[in-house]
Curated annotation (Swiss-Prot):
Organism: Xenopus tropicalis
Active site: 112, 336, 338
Name listed for the protein in its UniProt record: Cysteine protease ATG4C
Protein family: Belongs to the peptidase C54 family.
Gene from which this protein is expressed: atg4c
GO MF: cysteine-type peptidase activity; protein-phosphatidylethanolamide deconjugating activity
Described purpose of this protein according to its UniProt entry: Cysteine protease that plays a key role in autophagy by mediating both proteolytic activation and delipidation of ATG8 family proteins. The protease activity is required for proteolytic activation of ATG8 family proteins: cleaves the C-terminal amino acid of ATG8 proteins to reveal a C-terminal glycine. Exposure of the glycine at the C-terminus is essential for ATG8 proteins conjugation to phosphatidylethanolamine (PE) and insertion to membranes, which is necessary for autophagy. In addition to the protease activity, also mediates delipidation of ATG8 family proteins.
Length: 450
């Protein structure tokens, strides 16, 4: 009886917490987001220009004519909007099956970094199976009338001219990344769209669902209700993909950089395992400063988000985790996991997809960013990894005034430098002793999540 009473109290607390988060964050979701004029907008390696060529438009974005048509802008605006909405949005959920050995039926208040990690991996899987150019056919249908920033008047503020700092190293062109499967047919691409979302479902058997990540976290001393930093989440995602049994997932793996170093030989070993070539998601936990983010690193962050290989950044600001997907000028564009939504049963045929897609982007100043974050990249094969390493090295060299970059590429294996990169794990232990020491250091520096 006593245990049952305790469970009832915990469930009541969960419901109250969910209601509080919805009250706190729902208004943020509905708040208008404005974009500045005369600047490009970058979204996961793509650059969008919304040029307004009518000479009657004044320098402040106004117009001397009241008869201008929206057609001048609507096409490009729709491209950006459709691209953003098509990214998978994973948020707090409530009333899902109880997490094993706990009374939790919601992750409100503690699961935001797990959610941002899920979103980054989901983007990697979208690129892997469907290609970077894929967009959801119904993306524009869920656009809310409350998001007035997409009106023609505001769109004029998006009139961009490529910044000089990017003109030498970046071209505003669509990514040529090809999908693993031929998804010319709508039915085929939508099947994979639903399948990818189902892998992140909130029930125990989902490969990358909250239940599985919490289960893996137990092996490193984490339990449901604890906060998880970006570095820890990186290793949980790696372990989750290692343990996945779906045949479709055997062609992709995850590499987590050790001490801000990517050992190329270890990446090649993962990609060319057992005679088959795999795609790799590379996760690099870094710090962009000490107590606060060093503003000198902003050019680095912009350079990273402008690369076609980038699948986003697990980061945030103190006490809140966000999934960063782009930028404009000095503001980062992100997806917010803090809005609490109801559990969706993905076992139902044609389950609703709307709640897995965010209708509106949000922006925040780079100076508010917490220094602790994890950067993600996707490389389909060894050749792409070589190209990514080359492009990343350019960004690292050009964006820092320090004598050393935020992370480096080193030829050879980690073990050649007395580090363990691909350890053999015991069933009851997620991390090796060396990794535990490094993660303990990371954990003491990472932000505390509400």
């Amino acid at each position: 009886m006593e245990a049952s009473g305790t469970d009832d109290v915990e469930k009541l607390k969960s419901k109250f917490l969910s209601a509080w988060h919805n009250m706190k964050y729902s208004w943020v979701l509905k708040t208008k987001t404005y974009f500045k004029r005369n600047s490009p907008v970058f979204l996961l390696g793509k650059c969008y220009h919304f040029k307004y060529e009518d000479s009657s438009v004044t320098s402040d974005g106004g117009s001397n004519s009241g008869s201008e048509s929206k057609e001048d802008l609507s096409g490009n605006v729709d491209e950006f909007r459709k691209d953003f909405i098509s990214r998978i949005w994973l948020t707090y959920r409530e009333e899902f099956p109880q997490i094993e050995t706990s009374s939790w039926t919601t992750d409100c208040g503690w699961g935001c970094t797990l959610r941002t990690g899920q979103m980054l991996l989901a983007q990697g899987l979208i690129v892997h199976f469907l290609g970077r150019d894929w967009t959801w056919t119904e993306a524009l249908d869920i656009f809310s009338s409350e998001s007035e920033f997409w009106t023609a008047n505001t769109a004029r503020k998006l009139t961009p001219s490529l910044e000089t700092s990017f003109s030498e190293n970046n071209e505003c062109v669509s990514s040529n990344k090809q999908p693993l499967h031929n998804c010319d047919k709508k039915s085929n691409s939508e099947d994979f769209h639903q399948k990818i979302i189902s892998w992140f479902a909130d029930y125990p058997l989902a490969y990358f669902g909250l239940h599985q990540l919490v289960k893996l976290g137990k092996n490193s001393g984490k339990v449901a209700g604890d906060w998880y930093g970006p570095a820890v989440v990186s290793h949980l995602l790696r372990k989750a993909i290692e343990e996945s049994s779906d045949p479709e997932l055997q062609g992709i793996t995850i590499y987590v950089a050790q001490d801000c170093t990517i050992y190329s030989a270890d990446v090649y070993d993962l990609q060319c395992n057992k005679g088959t070539e795999k795609a790799v998601v590379i996760l690099v936990p870094v710090r962009l400063g000490g107590e606060r983010t060093n503003m000198e690193y902003f050019e680095f962050v912009k350079g990273i988000l402008s690369l076609e290989f980038c699948i986003g950044i697990i980061g945030g600001k103190p006490k809140q985790s966000y999934y960063f997907v782009g930028f404009q000028d000095d503001s980062l564009i992100y997806m917010d996991p803090h809005y609490c939504q109801s559990f969706v049963d993905v076992s139902v045929k044609n389950f609703p997809l709307e709640s897995f897609h965010c209708p509106s982007p949000k922006k925040m100043s780079f100076k508010k960013m917490d220094p602790s974050c994890t950067i993600g990249f996707y490389c389909r094969n060894a050749r792409e990894f070589e190209k990514a390493a080359e492009e990343l090295t350019k960004v690292l060299k050009s964006s820092t005034k320090q004598n050393y970059p935020l992370f480096t590429f080193v030829n050879g294996h980690a073990q050649d430098f007395d580090f363990v990169c691909t350890p053999v794990y015991d069933q009851n232990d997620l991390f090796t002793e060396d990794e535990k020491k490094r993660l303990k250091r990371f954990s003491t520096e990472e932000f505390v999540l509400l």
